[in-house]
From Swiss-Prot:
Pfam families: Ribosomal_L34. This is Large ribosomal subunit protein bL34. Coiled coil: none annotated. It comes from Shouchella clausii (strain KSM-K16). GO terms for biological process: translation. Belongs to the bacterial ribosomal protein bL34 family. PANTHER family: LARGE RIBOSOMAL SUBUNIT PROTEIN BL34M (PTHR14503:SF4), MITOCHONDRIAL RIBOSOMAL PROTEIN 34 FAMILY MEMBER (PTHR14503).
Amino acid sequence: MGKPTFQPNNRKRKKNHGFRARMATKNGRKVLARRRQKGRKVLSA
């Protein structure tokens, strides 16, 4: 049995899944648009 695979790191989390990261690419903006359309309270990490 190995180590737990989830190693929390807020900096990495924001850098990869944060709002600014989403806005930086065309597909990321599509993600936000879908989540807005769905009515998600939280759009990104």
